[in-house]
A protein has these predicted regions:
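Active-site-adjacent helix/loop segment of glycosyltransferases
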Residues: 176, 214, 218-301, 309
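A short, conserved alpha-helix in the catalytic core of glycosyltransferases
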Residues: 185-186, 191-198, 202-229
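A conserved acidic beta->alpha catalytic loop
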Residues: 40-49, 66, 97-100
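Short, acidic, metal-binding catalytic loop of nucleotide-sugar glycosyltransferases
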Residues: 26-35
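A recurrent flexible, glycine/aromatic-enriched loop bordering the glycosyltransferase active site
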Residues: 168-188
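Conserved donor NDP-sugar-binding/catalytic core segment of glycosyltransferases
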Residues: 102-143
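Glycine-rich, basic loop-to-helix element that forms the pyrophosphate-binding segment
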Residues: 64-84
Length: 328
């Protein structure tokens, strides 16, 4: 029997980063993908004009009238890939993330039986592993990862206890099961999209990929990490052991509210004992914000209240007012 090549739809979410988007779209159109779906989150930098000038039958552009954030953009794009393109597999990425040359061929060459999703190995353009996209095994579900995390915490290296190691990225390393993979180079089967549904657009930014993939795993879907499928992430965002300093300040709200949402899924019955530890750690971050330390604490407190209540209905305009920000 002849083997049928699975169709692949690529979903890219963009907002006012035309310089990044042009590289990503060119990279995608140079690889054997069947559909390229670009969700333009109300960009004002000429993105719409540039996209309208492209002439490739594989390209489908959805322009939102408002910025829906990454979560809203991925929700729209994944729905289009599932329901309109009806692709066998959908791969998602930000506008600054893109498949390395040969990545799609490497994915097609895989034995995909038994996997509902595949996460790529994400690197910076200079070859360094991109920390913010490093997959992990949930330590609350994996005793080995839990013990490794506890052992490394006194050394300030708890994160290394449950995230994949550098050796797992080496060429020839096996595909490994993981519980979380980011929305940069995550391939989702049609069955996974039908079973797991779509990301919640109310998350706006941050943590949508963690929450989505953790919920996939909790539903029994299998996610693999494939080191041979390589993606580039052209980002300057810094991810250190202590986390990031977020600007503009409205981003603080989404980071910590959504983190609590993800911790609730990950920790299960351990969530409430974990909350005081998280709050103590997070409030210490105020010192990193200098003259904005008091504002950081105000935003954090509201984020925590909403996160603990499971509240996702606060409008973006309300969050902008809370953070005294004019950013969209």
């Amino acid at each position: 029997m002849a083997h049928t090549r699975p169709s692949i739809a690529a979903v890219v979410v963009t907002h006012n980063r035309l310089d990044k988007l042009t590289v990503t779209v060119a990279r995608l159109l140079d690889q054997p993908v069947d559909h390229v779906i670009v969700v333009d989150n109300a960009s004002t930098d000429g993105t719409a004009d540039w996209l309208s000038a492209l002439d490739d039958p594989r390209l489908r552009v959805h322009r939102s009238t408002t910025n829906q954030g990454g979560a809203g953009g991925f929700s729209v794009g994944m729905q289009l890939a599932r329901d309109e393109a009806q692709a066998d597999w959908t791969v998602v990425m930000d506008d600054d993330g893109r498949p390395a040359p040969g990545a799609i061929d490497a994915f097609r060459a895989m034995d995909l039986s038994g996997w509902d999703a595949i996460g790529a190995a994400v690197h910076h353009p200079d070859g360094r592993i991109c920390e913010m996209n490093r997959p992990y095994r949930n330590p609350f579900w994996n005793p080995g990862a839990f013990l490794r995390t506890l052992a490394r915490m006194p050394l300030g290296r708890g994160r290394a206890g449950f995230h994949l190691g550098d050796g797992d990225y080496r060429t020839g390393s096996p595909v490994l099961p993981v519980d979380m993979s980011s929305f940069v180079g995550l391939f989702l089967s049609r069955a996974a999209l039908q079973g797991a549904g779509l990301p919640d657009p109310r998350l706006f930014i941050y943590g949508d990929d963690q929450l989505y993939t953790l919920q996939m795993r909790r539903a029994g879907l299998r996610i693999g990490f494939a080191p041979q499928v390589r993606f580039d992430h052209d980002t300057t965002a810094l991810q250190a052991q202590g986390g990031v300093v977020l600007r503009p300040m409205w981003k603080v709200f989404y980071m910590y509210r959504n983190a609590l949402m993800a911790y609730r899924v990950a920790a299960g019955p351990w969530f409430w004992p974990l909350v005081p530890v998280l709050l103590c750690k997070w409030r210490r971050k105020a010192a990193d914000y200098g003259p904005d330390a008091a504002l950081f604490r105000t935003i954090l407190d509201q984020a925590v209240r909403d996160g603990l209540a499971g509240r996702l209905d606060r409008s973006h305009d309300d969050i902008l007012r809370l953070s005294r920000s004019d950013a969209p």
